[in-house]
């Protein structure tokens, strides 16, 4: 999300990074409104799968469902890797060692399985704590960044134009349509999640009433925060945004170690919360397909805590 994507976006578009996030927010808002409208009429689990099946029939629904399960599982795997690498960097371990990362990854999956087996109450508590940690870290960063900008001259964005790689070529490429689209996709990744919110709507209270309100509101709040954090970071130290090799690039912008720790811990809490959400929502897409008899029905079997265990194992396997 916002902790992992800014560096890649800044390397593509330089000083235009904050504007790219605004453009990505606009696209996300359009899709969010679409999902919000659909959630009024279809309250089954599965989100995009359930909506497309209701609108276009079984064949399209099946295609969207399978695509969604695979893509969501892969995204879950990427996010899980991010959590492991961030945790390793916090404890001073080598985050590039594949053996260590793999052990951490499998350990994380076991922890997520245990959390899901306990039930939705624990999931809700963890999600709320991670949200508070994420918003708190980003909010503190924005406020601190504004103070730094007010009481200092800030950085010169033109410094990005003179950055060269080992071959003497500009690190920031020429701004073209292709570069814009690539950067937009990278920034859009920070907004992903709203399309999964309705995946477990059958386990929510009054989804037809609450989801149409929650999805657009969440996108609006997130867009403001994300724009603020990228804007402030680019004006504090744009060179660090582009050249840093750290997993959490935003921490490299600040020289203050306390701020760095706040950002890294906030990133870890956020990414862990996203993994918890992914472990809850992703299996339920495949479960929804099983309920519609488009995949074997044994994927609908749940534990006493309400976990579709076979669907969880399948999606976790794809993530691994």
Q: How should each PLM-predicted stretch be described?
A:
Residues 3, 44, 67-82, 191, ...:
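Membrane-helix boundary/coupling elements in multi-pass transport proteins
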Residues 1-5, 189, 318:
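The first (N-terminal) embedded transmembrane alpha-helix
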Residues 50-51, 57, 89-94, 165, ...:
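TM-loop-TM module centered on a large, flexible mid-protein loop between adjacent transmembrane helices
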Residues 87, 100-158, 192, 215-220:
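Membrane-interface loop-to-helix entry segments
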Residues 7-9, 49-55, 180-210, 214, ...:
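Helix-loop junctions at the membrane interface of multi-pass solute transporters
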Residues 80-108, 152-180:
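Inter-helical loop and helix-membrane interface segments of multi-pass membrane transporters/permeases
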Residues 4-99, 104, 218-221:
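Extracellular loop-to-transmembrane helix junctions
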